[in-house]
UniProtKB/Swiss-Prot annotation:
Note: HIV-1 lineages are divided in three main groups, M (for Major), O (for Outlier), and N (for New, or Non-M, Non-O). The vast majority of strains found worldwide belong to the group M. Group O seems to be endemic to and largely confined to Cameroon and neighboring countries in West Central Africa, where these viruses represent a small minority of HIV-1 strains. The group N is represented by a limited number of isolates from Cameroonian persons. The group M is further subdivided in 9 clades or subtypes (A to D, F to H, J and K).
Residue ranges, annotated region (Homomultimerization): 18-26
Disordered as annotated region, ranges: 23-49
Taxonomic path: Viruses, Riboviria, Pararnavirae, Artverviricota, Revtraviricetes
Keyword Nucleotide-binding among UniProt keywords: no
Alphabetic keyword roster: AIDS, Host cytoplasm, Host nucleus, Host-virus interaction, Methylation, mRNA transport, Phosphoprotein, RNA-binding, Transport
Mutagenesis / variant outcome for changing V109I: In strain: Isolate PV22
Name the record gives this protein: Protein Rev
Amino acid sequence: MAGRSGDSDEDLLKAVRLIKFLYQSNPPPNPEGTRQARRNRRRRWRERQRQIHSISERILSTYLGRSAEPVPLQLPPLERLTLDCNEDCGTSGTQGVGSPQILVESPTVLESGAKE
C-alpha cells in the first residue's frame, strides 16, 4: 500500500478483517418455506445488511480517520454536454470513449422538451 506508513496499514487490515467478519456473519437467507416466510427472512436479512453497512462505514471512518465517501467529482453543466458521433461510432465498443465534447451554445433540441 504505497504512500502509507506501516501502522496505518495495520489499522486498515484490522478494519477490513472486522468488516469481512461482519458480512460473513450474515449469510443469505434459506430459500425454503412459504412465500411469506421467505419474504420475511429476506426483509430481515436486508435490514441486517443495512446495519452492517452503516457499522462498516463507522469502522472505516474511525480506523482511517476519514469518511468512506469518495470526494465529489466536478462535472460540467449538463446543458453543455453533447455526444459527438461524426466519426464512425458504431464499429467498435471503445470508439467514442474519452473526454466529452463541450459546445459553447446549448443546443435547441434539449430545450424543446421543457415547457414553462
